[in-house]
């Protein structure tokens, strides 16, 4: 445990930031999971859930939780998953 007052404060700030970041990451994971389930089961609201997942990923990117490349990669992989399920097999 830190003895210096400023370090105690910085540890507290880091813990709060980590909790917020983990909450945002969890929201993103949940949104992606729901979208993938909707895509694979061909649910009627799959486009809404994909849009929600894109929105959550973009929010995480704008808040600095995800790097822009990571956010773009997640969006791209979700779109690829959606396209492979929606295009008919040849």
From Swiss-Prot:
Q: Which Pfam families match?
A: Ribosomal_S20p
Q: Which GO terms describe its cellular component?
A: cytosol; small ribosomal subunit
Q: Which domain of life is it from?
A: Bacteria
**UniProt GO molecular function:** small ribosomal subunit rRNA binding; structural constituent of ribosome
- Keywords, A to Z? Ribonucleoprotein, Ribosomal protein, RNA-binding, rRNA-binding
Q: Does the keyword Ribosomal protein apply?
A: yes
A GO BP entry: translation
Annotated function: Binds directly to 16S ribosomal RNA.
The family database entries (HAMAP family) matched by this protein are listed as:
Ribosomal_bS20
**What name appears for this protein in its UniProt entry?**
Small ribosomal subunit protein bS20
Name the gene behind this protein.
rpsT
């Amino acid at each position: 445990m830190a003895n210096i007052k400023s370090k105690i404060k910085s540890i507290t700030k880091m813990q709060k930031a980590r909790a917020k970041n983990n909450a945002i990451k969890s929201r993103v994971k949940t949104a992606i999971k729901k979208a993938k389930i909707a895509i694979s089961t061909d649910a009627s609201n799959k486009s809404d859930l994909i849009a929600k997942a894109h929105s959550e990923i973009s929010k995480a990117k704008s808040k600095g939780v995800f790097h822009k490349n990571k956010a773009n990669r997640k969006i791209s992989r979700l779109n690829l998953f959606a396209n492979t399920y929606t295009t008919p097999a040849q």
